[in-house]
Amino acid sequence: MYTKDTIVAIATPQGNGGIGIIRISGIDALEIAEKLTKKQLKPRYATFCNVYNDNEIIDHGIVIFFKAPLSYTGEDVVEIQAHGNPFILNLIIKAALNCGARIAKAGEFTERAFLNNKLDLAQAEAVADIINASSEIAAKSAAKSLQGDFSKEINNLLEKLIYLRMYVEASIDFPEEEINFLEDQKIHSSLEEIYKVILAIKNSCKQGVILAEGITLILVGKPNAGKSSLLNALAGKESAIVTSIAGTTRDIVKEHIQINGVPMHIIDTAGLRNSDDIIESEGIKRAIKKIQEADQVLFVTDDYTNSQVKFSDIKEIIPEFYDQIPKDIDITYVHNKIDLLKEVPHNHANHIYISAENNIGIDKLKEHILNKVGYTNQNESIYTARERHVTAINNAFEHIKLAKEQLELGNGELLAEELLIVQEYLNSITGEFSSDDLLGEIFSSFCIGK
């Protein structure tokens, strides 16, 4: 068991509330709690009592003792449920510090749970994901990962992979056998099965990252093309000021919405043009910077002299900014104000025709946005995933393809080597093999009381 010193932190959000919870974990948790309460605490019993600093009553509330290893961290844990006043909670924290505890680092309770094998790394990350989920679907997906569904799938895959690798290595270790193990159909079928499972997990992880992190959309275009109207139409409310005056939006305007349960971070930017206005020029600089950070760019135009606008044509529309826009960025051309046209062109490829002011074509645009990122609404098979999970799975997928190539070539040693590499990438997801730097980066993103 992982045992160090004893840590303490407030486990509930900042601010006033009906209840505030203080969590203590470590080898001296019970001793400290009994000093604070002047009570003998029984495991898994809720004890109503006063909380003291020396002999001075700070508050009264409910105290619960969880004896190791039957606790969140796997250590002795005490939770004090007091009144949710920050001043009172901080007084209790100070009293605990005086008794020998120290303030917990961000994510340290969950880190201790991981180190004590109460959960694996993917489950630990799911704790943060379920706290930060910004949609119902994201919360449900995070809950599945927290329950271990994602880890079970990875572990089942690892079991098959390890068995196959052992079988392949046996064929290398016993070359005197007359049987050519590499021609055994069992190896071919097992490798193909593993390949298909990794591919399925790869697709599921991609969906999971979208749910966990959302999609960042940037609205760009010339002034008065209708970017702010489009932001309001997508958000379903008046988030940005809309006027007929070009250059109204001078700074970044952000809105967070959901499309079919997928979090969307929409950013409206200043219209791209040369301007002598210092404030507007600064807004335009920020717009260019945001374009480089986007998952998708919605280029809004009301110029119908060229309804087949392509990326190269942006040089004609905004020539002064053409060189500053990444050439490989995913751009959708949103042709606005179609209510002013006698005949409306059909949507095609990356060209969507709308009227933001009259809410025409907005649903088609939303559908297009989801299709562009490859999101499919298959909730049952989606787990909340991190970018590092996707990277690990993508790498595993590339090496399982190389393993198939080596099998076809009859290279047993290289096949075994590729299978080992795949195993290492999969192990990194659940934390079977993880560097201290990676663990520090993951747990530092948690809130203090978790």
Curated annotation (Swiss-Prot):
Its EC number is 3.6.-.-. Gene3D superfamilies: P-loop containing nucleotide triphosphate hydrolases, Probable tRNA modification gtpase trme, domain 1, tRNA modification GTPase MnmE domain 2. InterPro entries: G_TrmE (IPR031168), GTP-bd (IPR006073), GTP-bd_TrmE_N (IPR018948), GTPase_MnmE (IPR004520), MnmE_dom2 (IPR027368), MnmE_helical (IPR025867), P-loop_NTPase (IPR027417), Small_GTP-bd (IPR005225). One of its GO terms (biological process) is tRNA wobble uridine modification. Its main location: cytoplasm. Pfam families: MMR_HSR1 (PF01926), MnmE_helical (PF12631), TrmE_N (PF10396). Mg(2+) binds at residues 228, 249. Its cofactor is K(+). It comes from the Bacteria. The keyword Disulfide bond does not apply. GO terms for molecular function: GTP binding; GTPase activity; metal ion binding. Keywords: Cytoplasm, GTP-binding, Hydrolase, Magnesium, Metal-binding, Nucleotide-binding, Potassium, tRNA processing. (6S)-5-formyl-5,6,7,8-tetrahydrofolate binds at residues 23, 79, 118, 450. Binds 1 potassium ion per subunit. It is found in: Cytoplasm. One of its GO terms (cellular component) is cytosol. Residues 214-374 form the TrmE-type G domain. GTP binds at residues 224-229, 243-249, 268-271. K(+) binds at residues 224, 243, 245, 248. Exhibits a very high intrinsic GTPase hydrolysis rate. Involved in the addition of a carboxymethylaminomethyl (cmnm) group at the wobble position (U34) of certain tRNAs, forming tRNA-cmnm(5)s(2)U34. Belongs to the TRAFAC class TrmE-Era-EngA-EngB-Septin-like GTPase superfamily. TrmE GTPase family. Homodimer. Heterotetramer of two MnmE and two MnmG subunits. This is tRNA modification GTPase MnmE. It comes from Francisella tularensis subsp. holarctica (strain OSU18).
